[in-house]
Regions:
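N-terminal beta-strand motif that seeds the catalytic metal site of vicinal oxygen chelate
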Residues: 1-19, 68-71, 126-134
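A generic structural micro-feature
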Residues: 2, 63-65, 108-109
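Core segments of cupin and vicinal oxygen chelate
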Residues: 2-3, 9-52, 80, 87
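A generic structural signal for ordered alpha-helices
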Residues: 6, 23, 56-59, 63, ...
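Vicinal oxygen chelate
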Residues: 7, 34, 73, 83-134
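Acidic di-acidic motifs
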Residues: 14, 77, 119
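Conserved short beta-strand elements that form part of the metal-binding/catalytic scaffold
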Residues: 29-68, 118, 124-129
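Ampipathic, surface-exposed secondary-structure segments
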Residues: 55-92
Length: 134
């Protein structure tokens, strides 16, 4: 039996601002934007090429906004991905790698090249470059 992670809840304070950030600046696909009753709204977005989506919502969960850290997006070319984010107005860190427990500015080896950014609500994201696939 397969167990698949399909949806991650991302706690936010402002649905419209978060939808614009993820849809227009980060480049996620907006799959769904629906109002469920008077107090509940759900927006589903999916990163290009991903099988896992995220929900931005109000009135569904009791998760404080801005508490998620380490949400990880794996990309084939971190320089291109980071440049796309910066071009769209996202503040992204320099490209870094971990060396003996310390972050160092420059590329690392396989699976050890990263950049970081946060959404407007303070949730932290990690870009990680995967090795080239044959």
């Amino acid at each position: 039996m397969d167990w698949r992670l399909e949806v991650v809840q991302v706690p936010i304070t402002d649905v419209d601002r978060a939808k614009r950030f993820y849809g227009e600046q980060v480049g996620f696909n907006v799959d769904l934007d629906t109002q469920i009753g008077d107090k509940m709204r759900l927006v589903q977005l999916t990163p290009p090429g991903s099988a896992c989506s995220m929900h931005l919502s109000t009135g569904i969960h009791n998760i404080p906004p801005g508490v998620l850290e380490g949400l990880q997006l794996v990309v084939p070319d971190i320089e291109v991905a980071r440049a796309q984010l910066v071009e769209r107005g996202v503040e992204a860190s320099s490209i870094q790698h971990m060396d003996d427990g310390v972050w160092v500015e420059r590329r690392g080896g396989d699976w050890n090249t990263f950049a970081f950014f946060s959404d407007p609500g303070g949730n932290g994201w990690v870009l990680q470059e995967r090795p080239a696939r044959d």
